[in-house]
Every structure is written in C-alpha cells, then in structure tokens.
C-alpha cells in the first residue's frame, strides 16, 4: 500500500456535454469563467491535480471544445497550488515543441505543469487533420519514443535522438523546466489498458492512468505495470484510477442518480463513441485494447468511470477509495455530474473520511471492507 496520502485529480470540463453522454441535467459548463472558478474551488477542497481533455472536433456529445495546453496554462495562472495536466497526442505534436511549451508553463506556474500522453483516441480527428492513423501497437511505440524525446529535451544539455518517428539533433532547451527533489521535470502521465500500454508505462512513464476498473482488474493492471518496470530496471510508475463519483446522503439517492443517467443516455452518441474507441483498440496483438469489454452503461461515462464503484454515501465511497489504495492506487481521477456543488461536497463529506481511514491503516491492520 502506498505510504503517501492519496492524491485526487478531476477531469476538467473543457469540452461541452459534461462527463456523461446523457440528456440528464448536468450543472456544468465548458467555458473558461466556470472552469476558473472550479479550479479554485477544487484546490480549496483537497484536489491536487486537474486533467484537461484533448478533443479537436465535435462529436459524441461534445460539440464545443477548448484546446488542452492553452487551457491548462490559463488554469495554472488562476490557481496557487493545483497542478494541471495537459493531454496531448504524440501524432499531432513534435516532442521538442511541447518541451518548450511545457518549460515555459512550468516557470509561469512555479513548477505545476504536467502532461498526459494519449496514444490513441479518435481516428476521424487524425484523418481530418491529414495525419496518418497508425495501428494500435505502433501508436504506443511512437508514444514511447515521444516520451523519451520529451524527457531528454527537459533534462539533457544537447538532446540527441534518432528514432523511427522523431529526431533531435543537439536540441538545447533553455530555460529548462523547474526541477525539485523527486521532480526533475514536469510529471509525465500516460493512459491505456492494453498490454502495450502497461509495458510502455513500466518502461518510461511517471504515472499510469487506468480506465475505471473493479478491484480485481486494478490488481491485475498494477502487477503487470510493476513487472514491466522491474524488467526495465526502474521504479514503477505511480498508478491513477478513473472513477465517476456520485456521492449522496443516502445509497438510494446515489443509485437513482446512476439509473437516471443511464436511462436518459444519448443512445446514438454512446454507440458512435463505442464504435470509434473500440476501433482504436481492435488492432492490438492480443485483442485487449481499451473499451473492448465495455458495456453500453460503461460507455455512457467516457472512461468506464462507473466500474470503479464510487457511488453511494460518503462512508461507502471513502471505504471503497481506501480499499483501492491498499492495492497500490496512488491517485483517483474523478468526474462529476454537477461539478461545483459536488466538488465542494466531496471536500466536505468524503475526503475527511478518506483521511481518517488512511490514518487508521497507518496505525493498525486494515479492516475496512471493499464492497466489491
């Protein structure tokens, strides 16, 4: 079990439509003013990180979207402690250019910039931008090379790389990003559920993000990533888990909210999203790409967030969160239906219970049920 207190991140709603593809009311907004207020509220309610989404075209319930790196910088400048993770596609960036942007953002925010490397997502976006859409495992091979080039740009005086996808020839980045003990450069996050994703995370990433999973699925993923890191001779990346959180005063209220979200799902958008993302992972060597076993209900929340089971009373959710920590989860990436009020509710009602359970685990044997 990680010794450090759990970290919490939230999905930034910088695209329209909220975090569920449903016609249920979502008291949220994709605009900057709303998100600036949300970022301040989040850092005052126990959140350590925010993750901006990367979308380039309308579709699947998201008709409007702000670009992730520029939006991340705006949120960094509006906050004092919150770390903001910008999602990027290797196929649409040169790592040296992103390294330059990241170094500047890191200085402007006093060391709070981070990046999430997204290997896949939507083929239609790459096609519309005139860029090649690689097969699944090739996308991860490119992403690994991207991360190596990014890290070299941030840490070496004259970075050199002669890769299959990128080249650096004596690239000298000045100023370097701000380095501190335990953080020599901006943190590098990476997502993915496939075998290729897990192997890559063990070799090069600082953090590994998983889609929503049950306890058994998370334990399997953590073991795979740690095994990959061991073979690479490096410390394993920290583990982040996605979850859509529905905390209510009673279990019945929480379950009814979930039932209504799914009952009012935008069927056409959910099925279109499912077809698009399954195509992205279908070409894996072992057929274990992201979303390959996701049900319709899972897909209503883009990243299988219902599967993590953070639905119920504050007490039940806190127990569930700490049960995952005992498996090795270091961070939860959370989404909400009504962001402002639910982030505040989380900070006031759920987080104190999590900290109490963590303290109890440090002083005695674990006895909290997982409610799997």
Question: Residue ranges of each PLM-predicted region?
Answer:
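N-terminal beta1-alpha1-beta2 module of alpha/beta enzyme domains
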Residues: 1-78, 176, 180-186, 368
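An alpha-helical appendage that flanks or caps ligand/catalytic pockets
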Residues: 1-14, 40, 129, 136-182, ...
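Acidic (Asp/Glu)-rich catalytic clusters
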Residues: 2-3, 40-44, 73-81, 102, ...
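Hydrophobic faces of well-ordered beta-strands that scaffold small-molecule active sites
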Residues: 6-10, 50-52, 83-88, 113-117, ...
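Conserved, mostly hydrophobic/aromatic
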Residues: 8, 42, 46, 75, ...
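Short, acidic/polar
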Residues: 29-42, 98-101, 191-200, 258, ...
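Alpha-helix-loop-beta-strand connector modules within alpha/beta enzyme cores
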Residues: 62-85, 142-146, 346-362
């Amino acid at each position: 079990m990680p010794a450090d207190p759990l970290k919490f991140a939230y999905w930034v709603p910088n695209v329209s439509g909220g975090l569920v593809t449903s016609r249920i009311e979502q008291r949220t907004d994709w605009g900057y003013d709303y998100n600036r207020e949300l970022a301040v509220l989040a850092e005052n309610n126990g959140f350590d990180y925010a993750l901006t989404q990367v979308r380039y075209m309308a579709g699947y319930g998201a008709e409007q979207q702000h670009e992730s790196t520029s939006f991340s910088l705006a949120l960094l400048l509006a906050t004092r402690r919150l770390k903001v993770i910008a999602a990027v596609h290797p196929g649409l960036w040169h790592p040296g250019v992103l390294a330059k942007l990241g170094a500047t953002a890191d200085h402007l925010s006093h060391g709070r910039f981070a990046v999430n490397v997204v290997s896949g997502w939507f083929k239609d976006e790459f096609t519309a931008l005139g860029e090649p859409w690689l097969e699944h495992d090739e996308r991860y091979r490119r992403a690994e090379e991207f991360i190596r080039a990014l890290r070299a740009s941030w840490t070496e005086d004259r970075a050199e790389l002669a890769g299959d996808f990128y080249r650096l020839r004596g690239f000298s980045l000045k100023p370097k990003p701000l380095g501190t003990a335990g953080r020599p450069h901006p943190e590098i996050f990476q997502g993915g559920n496939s075998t290729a994703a897990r192997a890559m995370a063990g070799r090069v990433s600082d953090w590994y993000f998983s889609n929503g999973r049950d306890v058994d699925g998370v334990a399997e993923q953590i073991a795979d990533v740690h095994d990959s890191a061991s073979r690479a001779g490096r410390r394993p990346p920290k583990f982040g888990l996605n979850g859509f959180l529905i905390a209510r005063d009673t279990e019945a209220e929480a379950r009814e909210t979930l039932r209504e979200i799914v009952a009012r799902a935008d069927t056409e958008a959910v099925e279109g999203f499912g077809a698009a993302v399954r195509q992205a992972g279908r070409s894996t060597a072992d057929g274990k790409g992201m979303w390959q076993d996701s049900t319709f209900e899972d897909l209503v929340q883009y990243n299988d967030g219902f599967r993590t089971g953070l639905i119920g009373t504050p007490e039940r959710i806190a127990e569930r969160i700490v049960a995952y920590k005992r498996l090795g989860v270091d961070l939860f990436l959370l989404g909400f239906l009504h962001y402002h009020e639910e982030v505040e509710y989380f900070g006031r009602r759920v987080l104190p219970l999590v900290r109490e359970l963590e303290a109890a685990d440090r002083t005695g044997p674990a006895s909290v049920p997982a409610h799997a």
